[in-house]
Each structure stands twice: as C-alpha cells, then as structure tokens.
Amino acid sequence: MSVIQDLQSRDLIAQTTDIEALDALLNEQKIALYCGFDPTADSLHIGHLLPVLALRRFQQAGHTPIALVGGATGMIGDPSFKAAERSLNSAETVAGWVESIRNQLTPFLSFEGGNAAIMANNADWFGKMNCLDFLRDIGKHFSVNAMLNKESVKQRIDRDGAGISFTEFAYSLLQGYDFAELNKRYGAVLEIGGSDQWGNITAGIDLTRRLNQKQVFGLTLPLVTKSDGTKFGKTEGGAVWLNAKKTSPYQFYQFWLKVADADVYKFLKYFTFLSIEEIDAVEAKDQASGSKPEAQRILAEEMTRLIHGEEALAAAQRISESLFAEDQSSLTESDFEQLALDGLPAFEVSDGINVVEALVKTGLASSNKEARGFVNSKAVLLNGKPAEANNPNHAAERPDDACLLTDEHKRFGKYTILRRGKRNHALLVWK
C-alpha cells in the first residue's frame, strides 16, 4: 500500500493538487516534503498532531520530511480563518517558542539514515531579505485580486469591525516563498498542512512554479471534528498540550479515554499507527462484546505512549486506577505533582483543618451540615481510606474537630486525596 493509499484509507486527505500525478511520483521515487509550524505558543497542542504524524507516515514510507518552524512567519501570525487580528509577540518570545517547538518535533522523526529528517527555520532566509527584495522578487508574482478572493480573507473583510491589516494580508506571500525556498534548498516537492492552509499552500505552488519552474504539490489534512459538534482538542481547562508541564500525561491519557464511541474508531485511524485491519478488528470485537468498548483504552494507551513514552503511560494508568482504589500507596510524588497540575481540583490547606471544613472548602459539600452527613454515612475517604474520628480530645465547642486532618494523612508531607462518593475528588495541597 502506498502512502497516499494509506492516507486515503484513514480518511486523512481533505484536498490535493493532482493526486494521480502525486501518487505516481511517490511510487516512482522518494521525495522531500514539508510542513510548517508557526510558534504561536511555547508548546504544540493536539491540534498539531495530524500534520506532525503525517510527516512521520511519509518518513516511514521512505520519504524525507522537513519540519519548518516559522521563526519569521511566527512574528506575524497566520490570519487564515481567524476572527480577529493576532497579537504580535516580541522577537525574544518567538525565538524561545521556536526552540521549544523544535525540541517537541524532534522525537517524532528520525534524523538518521538515508531519509533523515531536516529541521528548518524560515528566519534563516527572511532574516536576510530586505523590503525592496521582498516586493520586487516575491510581491510582483501575487495578484491582489486573487488574494482578496480567498475565503479566509473575504471572511475577515466582510466581518463588521474586523478587517485585516496589510501585515496579515501579506502572510500568504511569506508562506508561499517558504515552499519556493525549500524546493530550491532541499528539493521539496510537496507541502502538507491543515485544511485551513489550502489557500497558502496553493499560493506557494504557484510561486514555486514561477520562480523555480518546477511542478510541486499540495495536500491538506481534514479538520478534526467531534460527532457532537464541539471543538476537538479542547477541555474545560483549555487546550490539550503536548508539553507534559502544561498538560500532564495523566490528563492527556484521560482526554483520549473520554473520547465518544461515535468518534473513537475514526480517531484510531487518524492518530495511531495501528493498521486499518487492526482497527477494524477492534471495532468488530467491541460490537460483538455488548459491553464497554476497548477502543478508548487502546487509543489512550497508543497516544500517551507515542507522545510521552512508556513510563508516563504507566504513571497515567497507575493514577487512574489508584484514584478509585482503597490502597493508594503505589502513587509516587511525581504522580501527585501531575494531579496538582491538572489532574484534580487542587486546594491549598493549612494544619488544623478538619474533614468537614475540607469538604466545604473544596466544594464537595455545600454546607457544614451536608458535609457532616457525608462523613457520618462513611461516604468520605482520605487517600482511599474512610474518614474516621481521630481526635477524642477536641474542644466541645468544635465537634467537627473529632475528625481532624493530621500528618498521617499527608502523602510526601504535602498531599491528601479527598474523595466523596465514587467519583468526586479533590486534592489538598498542604502549605
């Protein structure tokens, strides 16, 4: 199966230029292809995964991937289908983000062998280009009429109070020149990107033909949508980042575990390297079992292992199991740090707090009266163990102090998992 056929079988092709000619070229020879990543934050998020993984799929098929980090274009920001002007970031900020994203992209690709991946930065050529060169050598090849007719530009112009600055309007010229430059430097003949990049990609194809007299191709990947119409890649806490310090491996694992049944088999095709036959077998087994599908667990394991590694996957599984177990002794200090980052609602507490106060502080009870009822009915657990009276000498005027949180409840001297009922948790972080 060719790489194009594999992408088609996974429904990973939104648009291409001359797919038959591209497929024939890929079957005849190994090519260089690229995808650009603008540094708009200090980390990639799961919305970047499709193009990153597509580069990897092409490399596994023997082609040479080029990961282009937009040190120059990131100074402007792509306006494609954005409702308003992007905020401009300082050169120092963008440079720091460039380095972070380069480091994140590196593990996905192999930089050894005959088709070793290439890491490029468009600041290397735009940093040496002056304004007159840009207008003479690049600008003259672009029709303003054609640029105004691009859907992404028309949407901004037609939106009341929005408009588009010349800075953002010129973005497609910069991205278009990237293709021509990478074609000249490395022989790149294919640009891939998200479906919102189609206009920028075709601009690059046209410019490369004019400047280099070469036929090149474009391929876009689909916009990832969820069956319920909500945006993929967002949680109540915001974006799901690939950086473990911004989204913990545990939360990352949980994100995939919570994928809807209607989406999970599509996402297995989109994001994993399991074969179509393996995915079809998982779906058939799930349908035949009549019980909880296995697909979400497989997806969560595959993605967490791919992004964070085997050790992080084991930690995510350990945390997931321990939160609902009586014995939480297997949790490590690092596990608690993940929970404090984004795994559980976390609350700072001080010595002397009792369980009733902790329940109200964390929102696990709406009042002291309700909290006492939970405690008396044995519905409250501390680190997996039922909360019990442990302070017989409490003051008569403070009856709730009969169940006091003490040092014995502190894991690693700092953390206590408070649980009410089966699924309601909070993390107490001791000052």
Swiss-Prot record:
> Is the keyword Aminoacyl-tRNA synthetase assigned to this protein?
yes
What keywords are assigned to this protein? Aminoacyl-tRNA synthetase, ATP-binding, Cytoplasm, Ligase, Nucleotide-binding, Protein biosynthesis, RNA-binding
What positions does the record give for the motif labelled 'KMSKS' region? 231-235
Is RNA-binding set as a keyword in this record?
Answer: yes
A single GO molecular-function term is: RNA binding
Q: What class of enzyme is it?
A: ligase
What the record says about family reads: Belongs to the class-I aminoacyl-tRNA synthetase family. TyrS type 1 subfamily.
Function, in words = Catalyzes the attachment of tyrosine to tRNA(Tyr) in a two-step reaction: tyrosine is first activated by ATP to form Tyr-AMP and then transferred to the acceptor end of tRNA(Tyr).
What is this protein identified as?
Tyrosine--tRNA ligase
Q: Which gene name does the record give? A: tyrS
